[in-house]
């Protein structure tokens, strides 16, 4: 088994790590994210992303105590509110209309844990400015986006068709897609997972 375990089933996180040449195994956590969010509703969305990442990493690291485990999570904040992934595609229209012409935050949290204890943590926030898109574009997007509508909290995949929603962004590409890669690679070098 690889020295690193990814405690996530996220396809974009798996692809990003693999493309960067990092060897890892995937063991998604079974953490109840909704229960944690409800219990910690007083925390801001950035702190919730880190808390969820820590819970995932620590939970999986108890099962695989000899391995370094990476937990990751991302939250979205619009108008000061924490938003969740949509449970069904037909809710995407209203979500995207609520985002039209506005800025929102994506907060990414990463935690490396071993033996049930967090050893390293990172929080990064990005600002994304949704353009004032037309209803015609919205119809096209909803018809074309497919699983993007429910796979991510914003009803978009920034690395795919969702990029057309934005005027500009302030933040690192990898942070926007949910895995701030460069600081993570520095930490993995420090822990001896990849070559320094």
Stretches found by the model and what they are:
Residues 77, 111-114, 131, 168:
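Short beta-strand-to-turn element immediately C-terminal to the catalytic PLP-Schiff-base lysine
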Residues 22-34, 109-117, 151-163:
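Mobile beta-alpha loop/short-helix "lid" or hinge segments that flank ligand
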Residues 121-195:
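Active-site oxyanion/phosphate-handling segment shared across diverse enzymes
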Residues 74-104, 130:
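Active-site-adjacent loop/tail segments of enzyme domains
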Residues 17, 53, 73, 92, ...:
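Residue-level signal for inorganic ion chemistry
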Residues 97, 109-113, 117-121, 125-126:
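Anionic-ligand binding region
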Residues 68-74:
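Glycine-rich phosphate-binding loop
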Residues 1-68, 81, 136, 143, ...:
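N-terminal polybasic phosphate/anion-binding patch
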